[in-house]
A protein has these predicted regions:
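C-terminal motif of bacterial Sec signal peptides marking the signal peptidase cleavage site
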Residues: 8-12
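Cross-family detector of peptidyl-prolyl cis-trans isomerase
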Residues: 13-182
Length: 182
């Protein structure tokens, strides 16, 4: 009786897609999104040669090969590069999911001032090249995901931005994140 039950459980697990197949579908969906939106992908070497900026008018995004993150720097900011230590960060965001056909659906946002008077806040700790952060348990990201976890894909850009407090000097980016980074 026990062997039969185990056999049925193993057999039923084969009906779904493997993790590798799901990752491949995600890569394909991201590629379709890039094609649909006529995004020009540059490598990290070119990004660094351009002083860690992207050409927004050419719709450039840099691909960070190790993480699979794509980033477009719209406004780098006029603050300073982050020093080691603890930093209070304020963020407004629009989170979308890329579907199999490369189109998007909005999942979460805090960009509408009359709905979200305050940006989300997270506390960032930087120690040498290591970044970690957690959201305050009161913002839109916490409400959407019931977690204070700041996605690792949100941290990578902080190595290239000049974060400041003035609205006129804000940093603004667009990211395309694989599920493992977002």
């Amino acid at each position: 009786m026990m062997v039969c039950g185990l056999g049925l459980a193993i057999q039923s697990c084969n009906d779904g897609k493997t993790y590798a197949e799901l990752k491949e579908e995600e890569r394909d969906a991201i590629q379709r999104f890039i094609e649909l939106n006529e995004i020009k992908v540059i490598d990290e070497e070119q990004f660094e040669a351009q002083d860690s900026t992207t050409n927004v008018s050419a719709n450039e995004y840099v691909l960070f090969d190790e993480s699979g993150i794509y980033m477009q720097v719209i406004e780098r900011g006029n603050g300073e590069a982050l020093e080691d230590g603890r930093h209070e960060m304020l963020v407004r965001y629009l989170e979308k999911q890329i579907g199999e056909d490369g189109t998007t659906d909005t999942l979460s946002l805090n960009t509408i001032p009359n709905m979200f008077a305050h940006p989300d806040e997270f506390i960032l700790t930087k120690q040498e090249n290591s970044l970690s952060a957690s959201f305050a348990a009161s913002g839109a990201m916490y409400q959407a995901h019931s977690s204070t976890y700041v996605p690792s894909g949100w941290l990578l850009p902080l190595n290239y931005l000049r974060v400041g407090r003035e609205i006129s000097g804000r940093s603004k980016i667009k990211l395309i994140l694989p599920h493992s980074q977002g």
